[in-house]
Design a protein with these regions (language model features):
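Flavin (FAD/FMN) cofactor-binding and adjacent substrate-gating region
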Residues: 44-75, 228-251
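Charged, glycine-enriched surface loops/patches
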Residues: 40
């Protein structure tokens, strides 16, 4: 049976960055599984823009050289800001070709304990044993669907992650549920696709990002103040951004304070550049969906104010709820062995779980290391921490 030292499950930003860092270890037998950038390419809508700032959109590389600027130069194209989804996907694929050209695009069907570490079964039945497993499988398995919509067929109710193009909704009535970036940008894209859109959110008001300075003050003081109040990682509001950029500090804070920081940093909010695009889209605040049922080929939705809507489709911009038991490739005995909190794995140094030599990167690491792990800008910390854990040495790598 084939063996390796490390198997990485997932070929998105976290999996690719981890692989690039581990490839610097001489003699390490590394395998990477997954379709590169697949979630970004297949489960996010065409026309989307990344909410994160330019400085927070690089996939970390051990030499700090595979940046957005490097891709612009190599591809002879100029990125706009905010960064369009399609350009970021192409950047990720370029990163993969440069740093991790030998990705195995087969899916991992099962991971189970083995005497020498872990036994992996691939989708075609091939098996291998790896001494260490890095789970960088993203958030696709965690799409949250409120119970009010259980039982409704996908013809009338879907999560935003189930779409890569909203043009099919042209001429249809769509109710969008949610008040964060996903819901608001989906509402804008649907409106631009000539759908009849309404957004419903339980929030008393919408929160908009990057609105903390007036335009006049921005040009006078913006750059200086931003350097003081905001880390390049671009996670969290002024005052806590610099703290959240340091997961090694965050993880040592009292648990209740960590939870408050994570809640504040990741509360539903939209990028300010959506404001103009949402003009003409009705947005109902302080409203929740009580129930929903089929009405012929449509869906009837009941709100908590007693009103009803009968629409062609309900789009759930309701985010993601981490629960690693929903990673279908993890054998039940592994899941049972993992120490968890609210669905998150409890991790220690190197993002290692309670199962020795099994690590979790990306959003599942947020409970232990803070909300930075939910964003691309967290790849730098995660990859360096992982490398340090495996080699027993400080990374000693250049700044990005």
């Amino acid at each position: 049976m084939t063996t390796c030292d490390v198997a990485i499950i997932g070929a998105g930003p976290y999996g690719l960055s981890a692989a690039a860092h581990l490839r610097t270890v001489k003699g390490l037998e590394l395998r990477v599984f997954g379709v590169p950038m697949s979630f970004w390419n297949r489960n996010m809508p065409a026309g989307m823009f990344l909410r994160s700032a330019w400085t927070a959109t690089h996939v970390a590389h051990p030499a700090g050289c595979l940046t957005l600027e490097a891709y612009q130069a190599a591809s002879r194209q100029q990125f706009s800001t905010p960064v369009p989804l399609d350009q970021f996907v192409q950047y990720g694929l370029w990163y993969q070709r440069q740093a991790v050209p030998d990705v195995d695009q087969r899916a991992v069907a099962t991971v189970e304990p083995a005497p020498m570490g872990f036994r992996l079964y691939l989708e075609d039945g091939e098996a291998l044993v790896s001494r260490r497993v890095i789970v960088a499988a993203g958030i696709g398995a965690f799409a949250y669907r409120p119970p009010q919509f259980f039982g409704l067929p996908p013809s009338v109710a879907t999560h935003t992650s189930e779409h890569s193009d909203f043009r099919d909704f042209c001429g249809k009535s769509v109710l969008v549920v949610g008040g964060g970036q996903s819901a608001l940008e989906s509402g804008a894209l649907l409106h631009e696709a000539r759908a009849d859109v309404e957004i419903v959110t339980r929030a008393p008001r919408l929160h908009w990002l990057q609105g903390w300075l007036s335009h006049a003050l921005h040009y006078r003081l913006g750059a200086f103040i931003k350097q003081l109040l905001y880390a390049p990682t671009d996670v969290g509001p002024a005052g806590i951004s610099q703290l959240l950029a340091r997961p090694e500090i965050v993880r040592r804070l009292p648990r209740d304070l960590q939870d408050k920081l994570r809640k504040r940093a990741t509360r539903p909010a939209g990028a300010r550049w959506l404001v103009e695009r949402l003009k003409g889209v009705p947005i109902r605040l302080r409203r929740s969906v009580v129930s929903a049922e089929l009405a012929g080929e449509q869906v009837k939705v009941h709100l908590d104010d007693g009103s009803e809507r009968t629409v062609d489709h309900v789009l759930l911009g309701t985010g993601y709820k981490i629960d690693i038991s929903k990673y279908g490739f993890l054998a039940p005995e592994l899941v049972q062995s993992l120490r968890r909190s609210n669905g998150f794995p409890v991790l220690k140094d190197g993002l290692e779980s309670s199962v020795p030599r099994m690590h979790f990167l990306g959003a599942p690491a947020a409970w232990s290391f803070g909300p930075l792990m939910q964003f691309v800008s967290g790849t730098r910390y995660a990859s360096r921490s992982l490398l340090r854990c495996i080699t027993g040495k400080a990374a000693g790598l250049p700044q990005p």
